[in-house]
Amino acid sequence: MRVEIITPDKELFKGEAKSVVVPGVDGSMGFLNNHAPLITVLKAGDVKLRTESGEEVFPVKGGVVEVMNNTVLVLAE
């Protein structure tokens, strides 16, 4: 699936991932291909991506995640 992680200052990641785990306000949430559409708020924690080359971790202070059409967009602080 396509993943973008964007902060007000810069784009942290743009590319493909096998899975994404985000720190939702009600607990961690994981996304795989063909996930149902979703928009939710994030709390401080780590966004974890599993890519072809391994795992990548991006700390965030909060934000919003949108999942739609095999695209995960993280607007992070």
Regions found by a protein language model. Give the residues of each.
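Compact, glycine-rich, soluble single-domain proteins
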Residues: 2-77
